């Protein structure tokens, strides 16, 4: 038997109770040692959050660029106009991420990368773009800056990498089917991704 729950402390108490009950009637295997495994999706989240720290500055620059464009209808209109000039299909929605949810960072980067040429041309059309992204956030704390080629390269690679994690997360988070038997295979796949 396998029990999969989220990481709430009340669940730890419930699983401990279940383990004690099973041990008292001698129905557990290995004393219930493997009865409760942490949620695979939560473990994946911890792995990805740690990895995001490696390219944090690039993510901050892309995020700031999106925030600038979305912060006003005239800016967004100019952005869409540049997308037409650059013949960039502008169906992807520019969204900001929630910093604590890596899957939203994945969605943000995936959409932003489709507009890389537009972001590259935007400073030519709006001088305030560069000024604002370089301006101090608060006294003594510089702005993140304008995303450069290195940042976009990081964003593309990270979006591709996170896409794999998104697929694994979907597979282990299924709520209408049993996933306990796939855990080892999925973690093995993650191990291969990380080692590449």
PLM feature segments, named:
Residues 1-196:
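A eukaryotic "domain-edge + linker/cap" signature
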């Amino acid at each position: 038997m396998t029990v999969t729950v989220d990481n709430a402390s009340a669940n730890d108490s419930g699983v401990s109770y279940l383990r004690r009950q099973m041990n008292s009637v001698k129905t557990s295997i290995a004393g219930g040692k493997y009865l409760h495994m942490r949620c695979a999706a939560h473990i994946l989240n911890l792995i990805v959050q740690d990895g995001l720290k490696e390219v944090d500055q690039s993510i901050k620059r892309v995020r700031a660029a999106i925030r600038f464009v979305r912060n006003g209808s005239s800016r967004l209109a100019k952005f869409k106009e540049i997308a037409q000039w650059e013949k960039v299909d502008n169906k992807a929605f520019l969204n900001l991420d929630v910093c604590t949810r890596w899957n939203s960072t994945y969605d943000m980067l995936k959409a932003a990368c489709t507009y890389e040429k537009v972001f590259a041309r935007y400073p030519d059309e709006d001088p305030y773009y560069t000024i604002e992204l370089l301006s101090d956030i608060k006294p003594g704390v510089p702005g993140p800056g304008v995303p450069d080629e290195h940042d976009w390269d990081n964003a593309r690679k990270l979006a591709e990498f996170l896409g794999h994690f998104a697929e694994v997360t979907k597979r282990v988070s299924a709520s209408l089917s049993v996933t306990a038997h796939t855990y080892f295979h999925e973690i093995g796949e993650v191990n291969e991704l990380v080692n590449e």
